[in-house]
Curated annotation (Swiss-Prot):
It comes from Brucella anthropi (strain ATCC 49188 / DSM 6882 / CCUG 24695 / JCM 21032 / LMG 3331 / NBRC 15819 / NCTC 12168 / Alc 37). Residues 1-20 are annotated as: Disordered. This is Small ribosomal subunit protein bS18. The lineage of its organism: Bacteria, Pseudomonadati, Pseudomonadota, Alphaproteobacteria, Hyphomicrobiales. Binds as a heterodimer with protein bS6 to the central domain of the 16S rRNA, where it helps stabilize the platform of the 30S subunit. HAMAP family: Ribosomal_bS18. One of its GO terms (biological process) is translation. It comes from the Bacteria. One of its GO terms (cellular component) is cytosolic small ribosomal subunit.
Amino acid sequence: MVDINQIPTRRPFHRRRKTCPFSGANAPKIDYKDIKLLQRYISERGKIVPSRITAVSQKKQRELAKAIKRARFLGLLPYVVK
């Protein structure tokens, strides 16, 4: 019979925490006129991508959502993409 203690075990895999792309010294400012930046945080269907996927902090996610909504209202970004 095989002893359980003799079976080699795997090393545990630790995922590194993603850091917020908007915090730091040379981080870009969130602005409703910066369409190229805002489009990175919108899905193909036109929805705002959640922060658990983009690793944006809670405070910056609120700013980002407000900027996206403002750009949509002004016609700079589409509400829905077909």
